[in-house]
């Protein structure tokens, strides 16, 4: 009995569905083709998923490299305790989502964190920043505004969610990953 088969059905987000490739912050290929053929396995990047999980590079890239059609940064401010502020920069082109930057910042709501977020937004040419409303009722976004005005004026929106974080992550990523559109 191969128990890994049941594990694959139990967990909706699969590492194998990702497309792994170097990403330019300004341009991307018009079309990226995914394949889980053995010749596309990336062997020099450690995969820490289940047994049998692998990272795959694109099977093919078609068309010219063209500018992204949109960009967004999502910020999940650190809560109480020792967690970090999570930041993810995503760009869009032809139905694909390209993660150009993803990191965690220690330091809570300090000026250095707010400045770093603003500079990352500038480096990634972000159009819109979505900030998850935690317990402060929009306080983090208000603290971020003056730094954005100084380093990278862009649209800033508070996002309020009622679902648990894990379910939101799965609901957002599963359709994108299953169709091999997260790069």
Kindly give the residue locations of the regions a language model identified.
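RNase H-like, metal-dependent nuclease domains and their acidic two-metal-ion catalytic environment used
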Residues: 1-160, 182-183
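Conserved beta-strand -> loop -> alpha-helix junction used to position metal-binding or nucleic-acid-contacting
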Residues: 150-178
